[in-house]
Amino acid sequence: MRIGHGYDVHRLVAGRKLIVGGVDIPHELGLLGHSDADVLLHAISDAILGALALGDIGKHFPDTDPRYKGADSRALLRHVMELATRKGFHLGNLDATIVAQRPKMAPHIPLMREHIAADLMADPDRVNVKATTTEELGFAGRGEGIAAYAVVLMEEK
């Protein structure tokens, strides 16, 4: 078994959709990035890649490559999971935390878990997503961005 940790952060800006955990969340601001900027799925992808010593999301999907402009992060996560499967691993469990002052993430977490479990070919009871604020401290607390942390346990088949 192997453990991986992932972290990602994206700036909130006008004129972009807010997509977190594969869910389109109504909000006046969205996350800025080369792809759809799904901060949670990027952190999860990095955690899986790290557990398997396969580098990071930037190595596999560089922001200099036009193929990934506006890319669906769910498709990227599925590709990462295919790499894990080819190496003989499946998800043991995932624990992830979204750090956002607003909008509130709690109403969207059940659908996020459903999407993530499907993309990782795992039972939903192996996928945990939670959200917290920073009590209005720092960039997240000021509403300038959203961060996410993820820890995965990958098990050999």
UniProtKB/Swiss-Prot annotation:
It comes from the Bacteria. One of its GO terms (molecular function) is 2-C-methyl-D-erythritol 2,4-cyclodiphosphate synthase activity. It catalyses: 4-CDP-2-C-methyl-D-erythritol 2-phosphate = 2-C-methyl-D-erythritol 2,4-cyclic diphosphate + CMP. Keywords: Isoprene biosynthesis, Lyase, Metal-binding. Binds 1 divalent metal cation per subunit. CDD domains: MECDP_synthase. HAMAP family: IspF. Involved in the biosynthesis of isopentenyl diphosphate (IPP) and dimethylallyl diphosphate (DMAPP), two major building blocks of isoprenoid compounds. Catalyzes the conversion of 4-diphosphocytidyl-2-C-methyl-D-erythritol 2-phosphate (CDP-ME2P) to 2-C-methyl-D-erythritol 2,4-cyclodiphosphate (ME-CPP) with a corresponding release of cytidine 5-monophosphate (CMP). This is 2-C-methyl-D-erythritol 2,4-cyclodiphosphate synthase. It comes from Geobacter sulfurreducens (strain ATCC 51573 / DSM 12127 / PCA).
